Amino acid sequence: MYVPKESQPKQGGGASGKVKDGKRKIVAQNKKARHDYAIIDTYEAGLVLTGTEVKSLRQGRASLTDGFVQIDGNEAWLHNAHIPEYSQGTWTNHTVRRKRKLLLHREEIDKLASKSEETGHTIVPLALYFKDGRAKAEIALARGKKEYDKRQTLREKQDRRESDRAIAAAKRKQRGE
């Protein structure tokens, strides 16, 4: 019996064991950026990578902690993202922290360029993932948080967690557990 390709189950995404979020296989996330910056707007950008970079990403090896995005001329570039060398690579291996071109539409680049020139605004990478077999980067226009903003965010998160625990405990008590 013929089964159309869309309804066939997807094959596994490799041995990396990283989280799959719908059709996205997330390779790396920048949790520090979400803590240090207030996210204003997010964009999805394609990445121009070499073969060994793709293979290293498929193994689930990357770090965006020190990464940032810079608009140079009419092109967006991802700087300081760490993609380690591919273990089976030879002399064709890539440079670990080279700048990588981001693929965005012209109007998105223009909007990011104008907004990032405003004081306090920057462009940070949030995640690297594969979507339909293509490497993508989620980038965000962000504004830096002050120290008291970070403390307030942590306090709100802790309060939310405590209230969720209290609600769960009340429900358990009500059920008689």
Swiss-Prot record:
CDD domains: SmpB. One of its GO terms (molecular function) is RNA binding. GO terms for biological process: trans-translation. The keyword Cytoplasm applies. Its main location: cytoplasm. Belongs to the SmpB family. HAMAP family: SmpB. This is SsrA-binding protein.
